[in-house]
Amino acid sequence: MIKKISLLTALSVTAFSGWAQETDNNAMVVTANRFQQPVNSVLAPTTVVTREEIDRWQAKSLTDVMRRLPGVDIGQNGGLGQKSSLFIRGTNSSHVLVLIDGIRLNQAGISGSSDLSQIPLSLVQKVEYIRGSRSAVYGSDAIGGVVNIITTREKNGTTLNAGVGSKGYQSYDAATQQALGDSTTATLAGNYVYTKGFDVVAYGTASPAQPDRDGFMSKSLYGTVEHKFGDQFSGFLRGYGYDNRTDYDNFSSVDTRQLYSQTWDTGLRYQSGIYSTQLIGSYSHSKDYDYDPLRGLHSSGSTLVDSQQYNAQWGNVLQVGAGTVSAGVDWQDQIIKPDSTSVNREESQNNTGIYLTGQQRFASIVLEGSVRGDDQSEFGWHNTWRTGASWEFIEGYSLIASYGTAFKAPNMGQLYGRFGSNRDLQPEESKQWESGVEGLTGPVIWRVSGYRNDIDNLIDATGSTGYVYENVGKAKIKGIEATASFDTGPVGHRISYDYVDSRNAITDEPLARRAKQQVKYQLDWQVYDLDWSVTYQYLGSRYDKDYGNYIPAVDDYQTVKLGGVSLWDLAASYPVTSHLTVRGRIANLFDKDYETAYGYRTAGREYYLTGSYTF
């Protein structure tokens, strides 16, 4: 079930879930402060999505999961597998830190941002999603928020899934988790997804017609072994990889993207009484090809980004009084190999971070703080900090306030790429304020927050800079987020409203591809054994650029306005037996035609049917 943080729950006898139909006081999260704590004790707005909910919604991608959550706006160049941008509270997609099992996703490539459309949904067992700055906990990138993808399965057993759908969609996956003796657990899972896709049609004045199907195929494999060496020591070894192929329309050509990615993690954990510690090491390697399918993967016109990333973490947690303190060290090394067509030679950068976080409760007041220092090989030392507090001024009603700093380090392409790179770039920097109130009024659990985010030293390359990357930009973001949940008999309701005014602080123009207003509504209803789910989303109007229409007088591309749209999804599931469940979904029920990225169509109405067998 989804869990939306409600501060009053941390201070009240009864814990309520602002985003769940049922209450689970034992739900734990680790993302907010890098120590395990009840979901109802975190000050920052936090949402947890479980595998149970992903199955109930019958989501087909991680972007499909994220688009339903408060503060999230998705811009995507077409359908399943097409390039996507995740905007949290109006910030850039590169301002979102994506973790997999608490370890940074490999972002050593040229763009420096995470494309969630490429992460197989079959890997995802839980999502912990934090809104607001978290650089004082994790370092670079966490300006808009943090998304932590958990792959660990909660219980043993075997699951077989098969699904079909519109546009030639097929999905097959199998997973098993078994105990090997009293101390060892092993998990193995595999997945295959394919769709013929549709013509996403990149329109532009410089673009010819490209009548084709832009399909997607993904194959993934996952395995892990966990072992308990005793009551206090445990360890794990985990590996996963995926092979994705995406056909897409560029503004001047038909292209194919081929992405190979593999990751290996291992770690040791120790816990004794009020103290625990863990040491984790990780290695990931990805090869990202872009090529003309008529000429082949290794043709002269193809491009390759061959990147590696090494991570090491040592974290310590100590229970102190009515709270917890966490401290540790992170180390990361990113490498682009010399056979990459995006750089002239092998390039690397490394970062070492030291952090301290803590939370304490004093009667009706909760205080939280974190501080971190990062030593980066290119720009040196950078400090960040964050503090927050809540006060239950009346039983069941709380005031919350926080302030924090954050930063985003220049990515590898901006520092070392063949076009416009600049080794003298400095980090993008952010200052964020947030305040809010939440309460329980009758059956309704609600929260209203207002926030402001000022971002300086934004990196850009324009004609005025000679098309060389410079720290020349500024952004000013103001917003309001309101959430509520309540039950009416057997029906659960969850509603969120987002108002985001995200602007270029120099020109006062709206930032591209971000809707000013969004409304999201989720209804879950179980009638006898039939489980219904209705999802509504209103996407307000947004602005984008027509990259086929350059205007020299203003050194920019023409701005275009994309209209708003209302979308409905309908899903239902029925347990035929205690082992077999059949699910069906209609996405975009009323077949609305809309765009979240200019020139790129969306899928229209789609139908899906899935069978799941567990034993």
From Swiss-Prot:
Pfam family name, one = TonB_dep_Rec_b-barrel
Gene Ontology terms, MF aspect: ABC-type vitamin B12 transporter activity; metal ion binding; porin activity
Where is the motif TonB C-terminal box annotated in this sequence? Answer: 598-615
- Motif annotated as TonB box, chain positions: 26-33
**What are the UniProt keywords, alphabetically?**
Calcium, Cell outer membrane, Ion transport, Membrane, Metal-binding, Porin, Signal, TonB box, Transmembrane, Transmembrane beta strand, Transport
Q: Which residues does the annotation say bind Ca(2+) 2?
A: D212, D214, Y248, D249, D255
PROSITE patterns, per database record:
TONB_DEPENDENT_REC_2, TONB_DEPENDENT_REC_3
Query: What membrane topology does the annotation report for this chain?
Result: Multi-pass membrane protein
Name all TBDR plug domain ranges.
38-152
Looking at the record, the residues that make up the TBDR beta-barrel domain are 155-615
Among its keywords, does the record have Transport? yes
Where is this protein found? Cell outer membrane
* InterPro entries xref list: B12_transptr_BtuB, Plug_dom, Plug_dom_sf, TonB-dep_rcpt-like, TonB-dep_rcpt_b-brl, TonB_rcpt_b-brl_sf, TonB_rcpt_CS
Which sites bind cyanocob(III)alamin? S85, N92, I110, S111, T303, R513, Y547
Q: Which residues form the signal peptide?
A: 1-20
Q: Name one GO biological process term.
A: monoatomic ion transport
- Tell me where the transmembrane regions lie: 158-165, 169-178, 184-195, 216-226, 231-247, 257-271, 273-290, 303-319, 322-331, 347-363, 365-375, 379-394, 397-411, 429-438, 444-453, 468-486, 490-505, 513-525, 531-546, 559-573, 586-597, 603-615
Name any GO cellular component annotation. Answer: cell outer membrane
Cited Gene3D superfamilies: TonB-dependent receptor, beta-barrel domain, TonB-dependent receptor, plug domain
Query: Which amino acid positions bind Ca(2+) 1, per UniProt?
Result: D199, Q210, D212, D214, D249
Q: Which SUPFAM superfamilies match?
A: Porins (SSF56935)
Q: What does this protein do?
A: Involved in the active translocation of vitamin B12 (cyanocobalamin) across the outer membrane to the periplasmic space. It derives its energy for transport by interacting with the trans-periplasmic membrane protein TonB.
- Describe the family membership recorded for this protein in Swiss-Prot or TrEMBL: Belongs to the TonB-dependent receptor family. BtuB (TC 1.B.14.3.1) subfamily.
Please report the name of this protein according to its UniProt entry: Vitamin B12 transporter BtuB
